[in-house]
Swiss-Prot record:
Keyword Nuclease: yes
Gene: vapC50
Swiss-Prot/TrEMBL keywords: Hydrolase, Nuclease, Toxin-antitoxin system
This enzyme's EC code(s): 3.1.-.-
Molecular function in Gene Ontology: nuclease activity
The protein's role, per its UniProt record: Toxic component of a type II toxin-antitoxin (TA) system. An RNase. The cognate antitoxin is VapB50.
Protein name: Putative ribonuclease VapC50
Record bears the keyword Nuclease: yes
Enzyme class, first EC level, given as a word: hydrolase
Provenance organism: Mycobacterium tuberculosis (strain ATCC 25618 / H37Rv)
Length: 169
C-alpha cells in the first residue's frame, strides 16, 4: 500500500526537489530506512545538546529537539501522544496527524497537491494506480484527506497518464 509519508513530502517536491516514494506495499518502518532518498529536508544536525531539555515522551525527544533546532512549525506524526501541547508550546511548534496536515495542504495548495498525487500515480508502475485507486489505498491512513481529494479527479478523467510535473523540468 502507498504510504501517506509520500504526500507529507509534497512540500519538498514543491520546493524544487524531486522526491522518491516507498515501493508499493512497503511498511512505513521499512520505508523510513530509505528516508535519505525522499526526506532530504527532514534531517537536522547539531540538536543533540537540546534533547535533555525536551519535555515530551523520552523516545521522541530527539524529534522535538531537531524541530526546535531547525525552527520547524509543525511535526507531522501519527503518534500525537508523544508530543503533548505543553511540551511544544514553548517552541511555538504544533504536532499534526498526517490527515490534518494533508487537509491543510489541500486547502492551501490545491493544484500543487493534485500535481503531487498525479506524480505518485505515475511513479507506481507495478501495479499501476489511477488517482482514485491511489486515494482508496491512502484512505486507510489518511481517510479525510483521501475523501476530500477525490473531488480533484472526476470519474473517467484522463489524469495520471504521462504527467510532467513543474519540478521535473
Amino acid at each position: 500500500m502507498p504510504c501517506c509519508g509520500s504526500l507529507t513530502r509534497a512540500p519538498i517536491g514543491l520546493c524544487g526537489r524531486r522526491t522518491s516514494w516507498p515501493r508499493l506495499g512497503e511498511p512505513w518502518s521499512t520505508a523510513s530506512t530509505s528516508a535519505p532518498n525522499g526526506l532530504t529536508t527532514a534531517f537536522a544536525f547539531g540538536y543533540n545538546d537540546l534533547i535533555a531539555a525536551m519535555n515530551n515522551h523520552y523516545k521522541d525527544r530527539h524529534v522535538l529537539a531537531a524541530a526546535v533546532r531547525e525552527r520547524a512549525e509543525v511535526i507531522v506524526t501519527t503518534n500525537l501522544k508523544h508530543f503533548p501541547d505543553d511540551a511544544l508550546k514553548p517552541y511555538q511548534i504544533k504536532a499534526l496527524h498526517p490527515d490534518d496536515f494533508l487537509l491543510d495542504q489541500l486547502d492551501l495548495y490545491e493544484e500543487a497537491t493534485k500535481a503531487v498525487i498525479l506524480g505518485m500515480v505515475d511513479a507506481y508502475i507495478d501495479p499501476p494506480f489511477t488517482p482514485h485507486s491511489l486515494l482508496d489505498a491512502l484512505g486507510e491512513q489518511v481517510p479525510q484527506f483521501a475523501a476530500k481529494a477525490r473531488r480533484l479527479f472526476p470519474s473517467g478523467s484522463p489524469f495520471g497518464l504521462g504527467v510532467l510535473l513543474p519540478f521535473d523540468q
